């Protein structure tokens, strides 16, 4: 595997700032107003103009809160409206509520997808900018209408399969937000930190010839198994971490289902289930904010005792793991990536410490520390 991210030294990071991220940003200062106009190019290749650093953001994805918390000391104050806040891990939401009680007053506007969004709802929040986390062609019409009303739209996700690898895509997204909010130093610092951690893993994998097969059991519940397809970023993370995702070669889209017969026929040596608090009422894998390790492990054990899972070599050999789905698809995906690398190639990464990485991110970057159990190993000593 031959892949190079930005150099982790600060001087080299700044010197090579746009090697992987051709993000066009021009800031024009007007002496008569004291304001700065910002021009940037988003993930969809669109040139976006902001009259000044954004103070009021409306977004279609409540998970943007974590991204904002990496570069803003008061991320909640920047959110003028959002869609589906209940999608957030409730333990994480409660942590933010303790620090920023006004989070409960953030209005719910629009929807996660364009078909559930109307222009009037978005405009009612009086936004400086509308931020879209996941591309959908339907957003283009809404973006055009917002533009006509004087509100720019920033796409953090590219249409189609991105040419950027997962680490580059996250850094690009952080970079965009940093420019839009006038928080470039903070965005630079986190991007450099994250990319250096990705690079350390990728460098060590360069000489590895074997790529173990992994069952990535998405939203692990009573039935097995829904798996990420070839176009899913989870598949990209696992590939970059030196593994192969079962089913990704036959499921070209975002996700699909594998029959129990297909799963046991392949009998992958590694099992990774994803879950979250929202699966508690469905008999699924529950882990996340505010949860202790013993409860998370018990949940993983319960899921693994069901159906075909208990027959797998991975489960019998205690190479079975669980991880927060939201963590894995968030701006903090470096934590999931380090877990994947450690689980897929344990002999190569005995010293890799995702928990230590989380501690450092909590101390150096996050406005609200991420506390709870976001990943668990079946073979760990309780």
Regions flagged by a language model, labelled:
Residues 59-61, 65-124, 129, 134-135:
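A short, structured surface patch at a secondary-structure boundary
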Residues 229-254:
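Alpha-helical, coiled-coil/dimerization segments enriched in small aliphatic residues
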